């Protein structure tokens, strides 16, 4: 069956909130992992099929732009493992992910649920998006960045 794994950093001052979330998500189908190592995160990506990214959801990009993901390295990391990203449609991740090509965008929670269900019910489509996600992630490799930076500098 499917599992939801929430993984990310948690500052000490947010521990009470984390405990509250763990209490609400008290089910065997949800794992909440805080402050895990890079190796552990890599293992999660290698086992995952779908990657949700929701930074900025419920916020205003006008009044609180800092609450949005500016780039989205975790999205690229997931894509490099062939995981299909389903990202909130505002901010950096929505520029990385080309909806319907190498992942999906969502605006409301209903969209997130519907798109997740579509991926689950059509594994061949999900596989295709995952393959394209790997290709797209290659655009963000350090070596490629260095080459583009040198090309830019040489134009001056």
PLM region spans:
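Short hydrophobic beta-strand element within catalytic cores of glycosyltransferases
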Residues: 75-80, 84-87
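Glycosyltransferase donor-sugar binding loop
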Residues: 3-19, 34
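A charged, aromatic-enriched C-terminal amphipathic alpha-helix characteristic of glycosyltransferases
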Residues: 107, 111, 124-155
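Acidic donor-binding loop of glycosyltransferase active sites
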Residues: 46-70, 83
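Conserved acidic donor-binding segment of nucleotide-sugar-dependent glycosyltransferases
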Residues: 89, 98-110, 117-124
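Flexible glycine-rich beta->alpha loop in the catalytic core of nucleotide-sugar glycosyltransferases
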Residues: 56-58, 84, 91-92, 102, ...
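Short glycine/proline-enriched, acidic/aromatic patches that form the donor-sugar handling elements
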Residues: 41-42, 59-62, 91-96
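Nucleotide-activated donor-binding/catalytic signature segment of Leloir-type glycosyltransferases, i.e.
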Residues: 18-43
């Amino acid at each position: 069956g499917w599992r939801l794994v929430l993984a990310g950093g948690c500052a000490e001052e947010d521990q009470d909130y984390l405990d509250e979330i763990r209490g609400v998500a008290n089910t065997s189908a949800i794992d909440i992992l805080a402050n895990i190592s890079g190796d552990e995160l890599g293992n999660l990506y290698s086992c995952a099929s779908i990657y949700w990214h929701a930074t900025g959801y419920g916020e205003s990009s006008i009044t609180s732009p800092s609450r949005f993901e500016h780039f989205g390295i975790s999205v690229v990391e997931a894509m490099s493992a062939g995981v299909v990203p389903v990202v909130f449609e505002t901010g950096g991740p929505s520029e990385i992910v080309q909806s319907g090509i190498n992942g999906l965008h969502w605006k409301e929670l209903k969209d997130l649920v519907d798109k997740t269900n579509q991926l689950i019910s059509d594994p061949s489509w999900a596989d295709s998006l995952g393959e394209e996600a790997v290709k797209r992630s290659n655009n963000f490799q350090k070596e490629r960045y260095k080459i583009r930076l040198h090309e830019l500098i040489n134009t001056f």
